[in-house]
Amino acid sequence: GSGTEEDPYLIARPSQLALLAQCVNEQTAGYFEPDVHYLLTADLDLSGYENWTPIGTGPQDGRYPYENPEKAFQGVFDGGGHTVNKLNVAYTGATTFTSVGLFGVNDGTIRNLHVAGTVSATTSCTDKSYVIAGGIVGFNIIAYEDAMNTRPGSGAIEHCSFTGSVSASCGNDPT
C-alpha cells in the first residue's frame, strides 16, 4: 500500500508490526504523520517478541504526552477485526514518563482490533514522573476543554477489546 485511506499500508506479519513501532518511534518520514493508514490483514502471534516495544512514545522531559505528542501514533490503524495474540510488554526502568501497551501513546485512530496478552510496567516515580499501562493503548490523547484549560487531541479507540492482564507500579506503590 501507499498509506492512504484507499490504499493503506498492509500488515500481515509480526515483523511488519514491529517495523511500524520502530518507524513511529523514530519519526521516520511517511510513517508517523497524521492520516497515514494501516490495515492489519491477519491475526498475529507476538510470542517471538519477548518484550514488545510499544507503537508511539511520549516525551522524556517530564511533560505529559498531550503537551508534546510528536512521537505519539498519529495515523489510522484498522485491525480489520483481527487479533494480536501473545502480546508481552514487561517494562522496568526509571524514566520521567512511561506509557505501555500495544500502542504506548495514541493521538490517532485505532479501530476493529482485538489484543490478548500481558502488559506490566514498573518504574521508580517522583513527583515529576508517572507510569501508565493499558492493553491496547497506554495513553490516549483526547481533546479537552473546561473553563480554564483547552487541550488539543484526536486519539480515538473504536471497536477494540483486550483480554489478559495489565499492571503498573511506581516503586513499591502499585497504581
Walk through the language-model features, giving the residues of each:
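Surface-exposed repetitive/solenoidal architectures
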Residues: 1-175
